[in-house]
A protein has these predicted regions:
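C-terminal regions of RecA-like/P-loop NTPase motor modules
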Residues: 1-10, 123-126, 164-165, 207-326
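Conserved inter-motif catalytic segment of the P-loop NTP-binding fold
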Residues: 2-4, 19-20, 24-26, 41-43, ...
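Pre-Walker A (Motif I) flank of P-loop NTPase domains
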Residues: 31-35, 72
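Gly/Ala-rich phosphate-binding loop of Rossmann-like dinucleotide-binding domains
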Residues: 57
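Conserved beta-strand segments of alpha/beta enzyme cores
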Residues: 100-102, 199, 308
C-alpha cells in the first residue's frame, strides 16, 4: 500500500506568539497539558483525584499552593466504579458541587482517548479539567498500550486537545509489578505514556504509616520539581496533610522515610519557646537551616502552630510565648 503523501508545511518561529504556562496546581498540574497520576491499586489515586475535583468544583484549592479563583466545570470518566453507588457517594462525602462535575454517557459506546466526544464535551461544558480513570480503559478496542507507536499517536492527539482548549487532562494509571524498577518503567504499558505527559505524580503508601499516602513528583518538564505532599485515609475520610519529607526512592522501595522535617521544625520551635518569649526570625531560619530544615518547612510549622510575627525596631521576631506544647 502506497504511503499517503503529506504536503510540506514550514513554521517560522518568528510567527509564534510566546505564551507562559498556566497552572491548575503549580508545579504539579498544568493547564493545556497531560498529567499522569500513577500508583499501585488501592493506594488512593482515585480518592485523591475525587477530592481534588470536589474542592475545585467549589472554587477551593486542595493545597495552599493551588490558586483557584472560581468554581470550575470538570469531566470525570471512570471505567472501574459505578456512578450511583460509588462515585456520587464519594463526591458527596468530599462535599463536592455535583452540578459542576459531569460524565460523558458511555451506555451506547465506550469512550476512547481519541473519541470526538471528548472534544465535544469540553466545548459544551467549558470544562477546565478532564480526568480519565484508568488510562488502559480508554485505549479503544484492539489497541495495545505496550506498543509504543500506537500509544504515542493516541497520547499526542489527547495532548493537542488539552492544548487547544487550555484544559488540564489527568490520566490515572496503575503501576505494574516490576518491583525495584524506576517509576517511569513501572507505569502500566508503554513508556510513551510517561514521555508525552509533562508532569507525572506517584501516589503510594508510606512504610510504617498505614493510613498515610505520599504524592511525589517524578517528572516535570515545565518547571522545578514540586515538594512532596501527603494525605491521610482514615475511617473519618480524606485529610490533606500538605508538605511531606519523602523521596520517590523511599516511596517505591518501601523505605521508612526520615523523620518528617515539619515535625522536627515544630520540635525546634518548642525547644526555643521553653527559654524565649520572642526570637528573631532570621535567627530561627539560620538555626533551622543548620539542622537541614528549609525555610518553607519552617514557615509551614509556624503556620500550624499559630505563631505571629512581631516587628521590634528594624527586625521581625516570632512570638513564642503563646505556644502550647502537646
Amino acid at each position: 500500500m502506497e504511503e499517503q503523501k503529506i504536503e510540506l508545511k514550514i513554521i517560522n518561529m518568528a510567527d509564534i506568539q510566546s505564551q507562559e504556562i498556566e497552572w491548575l496546581w503549580y508545579p504539579f498540574i498544568p493547564y493545556g497539558k497531560l498529567t499522569i497520576i500513577q500508583g499501585d491499586q488501592g493506594d488512593g489515586k482515585t480518592t485523591l483525584v475525587l477530592n481534588l475535583a470536589a474542592k475545585l468544583s467549589k472554587g477551593i484549592g486542595l493545597d495552599e499552593d493551588m490558586q483557584v479563583s472560581e468554581p470550575m466545570n470538570i469531566i470525570y470518566q471512570t471505567a472501574e466504579d459505578g456512578l450511583a453507588d460509588t462515585v456520587k457517594p464519594r463526591l458527596e462525602v468530599a462535599d463536592a458541587d455535583c452540578e459542576k462535575i459531569m460524565v460523558i454517557d458511555e451506555s451506547e459506546k465506550s469512550l476512547s482517548m481519541i473519541d470526538e466526544r471528548l472534544e465535544q464535551a469540553i466545548v459544551q461544558t467549558n470544562a477546565r479539567l478532564l480526568i480519565l480513570d484508568p488510562i488502559q480503559a480508554y485505549l479503544g478496542g484492539g489497541m495495545d498500550m505496550n506498543r509504543a507507536n500506537e500509544t504515542r499517536d493516541m497520547t499526542k492527539k489527547l495532548g493537542l486537545l488539552a492544548e487547544k482548549y487550555k484544559c488540564a487532562i489527568i490520566l490515572i494509571g496503575h503501576m505494574n509489578k516490576a518491583a525495584g524498577n524506576k517509576a517511569a518503567y513501572r507505569g502500566m504499558g508503554s513508556i510513551d505514556f510517561f514521555a508525552v505527559a509533562r508532569s507525572v505524580l506517584l501516589v503510594g503508601r508510606i512504610e510504617g504509616q498505614k493510613n498515610t499516602r505520599a504524592v511525589v513528583q517524578i517528572k516535570n518538564n515545565l518547571s522545578a520539581f514540586g515538594h512532596s505532599k501527603a494525605f491521610e485515609l482514615t475511617e473519618e475520610g480524606f485529610h490533606w496533610l500538605g508538605d511531606y519529607e519523602i523521596t520517590a526512592d523511599e516511596l517505591l522501595g518501601g523505605i521508612t522515610p526520615k523523620a518528617n522535617k515539619k515535625e522536627r521544625a515544630k520540635q525546634l520551635i518548642y525547644e526555643l519557646a521553653e527559654t524565649n518569649s520572642v526570637v528573631k526570625s532570621e535567627d530561627i531560619v539560620n538555626l533551622a537551616e543548620e539542622k537541614g530544615i528549609s525555610k518553607r518547612t519552617l514557615e509551614n510549622a509556624k503556620k500550624e502552630l499559630g505563631i505571629k510575627g512581631k516587628r521590634i525596631g528594624e527586625s521581625w521576631y516570632w512570638k513564642l510565648d503563646e505556644i502550647v506544647k502537646p
